[in-house]
A protein has these predicted regions:
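Short loop/turn segments that connect beta-strands within beta-propeller blades
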Residues: 56-60, 96-100, 137-140, 174-178, ...
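Short coil/turn segments within WD40 beta-propeller repeats
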Residues: 31-34, 49-53, 70-73, 89-93, ...
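Hydrophobic core register within WD40 beta-propeller blades
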Residues: 36, 75, 117, 154, ...
C-alpha cells in the first residue's frame, strides 16, 4: 500500500479574464439545487424539492420529473442515458427516456443515506454513510464492499474503487473472483469530493483531483499505474471557503464551493496549473458538471442553475 505525503506547493499562475456566466435558469428548484449531470445534449438538475428538472444547453426548461418525495442527494448517468438519483429517504431511483414521472422506477431502498454515486460505462457504484460501496450492473447488485468510513464521494474504474470522507482518499483494489474482498492500494491525505479526469490511457483517466484536508486547497495526482499516485501539484487556499464541487475533462478542471466562486484551471500536467479565472455565482456552489463546447453547469443553494464559460 502506498501512503503519499505532501508535495511542494505550486503557486497559481496568472489569471485570465474570460470567465463569465452565459446563462441562468428562469426558474429554480424549491430550496437548494443539489446536483447536476449532463448527457446527450441535455442537463439534469436535482433539488431539495425531490424533482429532477431537464434543461436545454441554454438552460431553457424542457420538463420536470417528480423523481422523489424528499431531498435529492446526488445523481449519476450511465452510457445509455439512464439517470440514477438518491434521496434522503434511503431510496435510489432510475429512469430512461422519455424522462417523465411514469418512467421513474425504484432500484432499491435502505435505511442508510446514499450520498455518492458514480457510473463507469454501464456499472453503477453507490456509497452510503455506513461506508458500504455497492456495485451494480444492469440494475442487479454485483458486490458489496464494507470500507468502514462514511462515503461522501466516490469513483470507480476497472478494478479500483476510490472513496473519501474528510481526511483521506482511499484507493481500493477489488480482489478478482471474491465477493466483497478488496485490498488498500493507496491512502492520500484529502477530503471530498474526488474526480477522475484527464486523457484516457488504456481505459484509465490520467489524473485524480480532490481538495486537501482544509477543504480550501486543491491537489492533483497521477492515476496511471506506473506513477503510483504521485502528486503533480498542490494549490493550498485557492478558495476562501470549503470546496463542495469539482468537475473536469481531458484539459480543464473546475472547482466551486461555499465562497460562491467557480474557478477554472488548465495545463493540468504542468508543475503548476494555469488559472482560467473565476465567476461569482452569488450563491453557494453545491454541484458542477461539464457540458459540451466548454460549458460548465452549476447547481447552487438559491435553487437556480447557471452555465459558465471560461474559454
Amino acid at each position: 500500500m502506498v501512503r503519499m505525503g505532501c508535495p511542494q506547493f505550486a503557486p497559481i499562475r496568472p489569471m485570465a479574464n474570460n470567465a463569465r456566466i452565459e446563462h441562468t435558469s428562469t426558474e429554480g428548484h424549491e430550496g437548494d439545487a443539489t446536483c447536476v449531470a449532463y448527457f446527450g445534449g441535455q442537463l439534469f438538475s436535482g433539488g431539495a424539492d425531490g424533482k429532477i428538472r431537464i434543461w436545454s444547453p441554454q438552460l431553457e426548461l424542457i420538463s420536470t420529473v417528480n423523481a422523489h418525495e424528499s431531498y435529492i442527494y446526488c445523481m449519476a448517468v450511465n452510457q445509455h442515458g439512464k439517470i440514477y438519483s438518491s434521496s434522503c429517504d434511503g431510496q435510489v431511483h432510475f429512469m430512461l427516456p422519455p424522462y417523465e414521472d411514469s418512467a421513474v422506477q425504484e432500484l432499491f431502498r435502505c435505511h442508510d443515506a446514499i450520498q455518492a454515486m458514480y457510473c463507469d460505462g454501464s456499472v453503477l457504484y453507490t456509497g452510503d454513510d455506513k461506508g458500504v460501496v455497492t456495485t451494480w450492473s444492469n440494475d442487479r447488485m454485483l458486490f458489496k464492499y464494507s470500507l468502514v468510513e462514511e462515503v461522501k464521494s466516490l469513483a470507480g474504474e476497472q478494478k479500483l474503487i476510490y472513496t473519501v470522507r474528510d481526511l483521506d482518499v482511499v484507493v481500493s483494489l477489488v480482489v478478482e473472483g471474491k465477493s466483497g474482498k478488496y485490498s488498500n492500494k493507496a491512502v492520500l491525505p484529502g477530503k471530498s469530493p474526488i474526480l477522475l479526469l484527464g486523457p484516457l490511457v488504456e481505459g484509465k483517466r490520467s489524473f485524480l483531483a480532490f481538495p486537501d484536508r482544509s477543504g480550501m486547497g486543491l491537489q492533483l495526482v497521477n492515476n496511471l499505474p506506473q506513477q503510483q499516485f504521485s502528486h503533480i501539484w498542490r494549490l493550498p487556499n485557492c478558495h476562501e471557503w470549503i470546496v463542495n464541487a469539482i468537475c473536469g475533462d481531458e484539459k480543464y478542471l473546475y472547482s466551486g464551493g461555499y465562497d460562491k466562486k467557480l474557478k477554472g484551471w488548465t495545463d493540468l500536467d504542468a508543475a503548476q496549473p494555469r488559472s482560467l479565472g473565476e465567476v461569482d455565482v452569488g450563491s453557494c456552489v453545491n454541484s458542477v458538471c461539464c457540458g459540451e463546447n466548454n460549458m460548465v453547469y452549476i447547481a447552487s443553494s438559491d435553487g437556480f442553475i447557471r452555465a459558465a464559460k471560461f474559454i
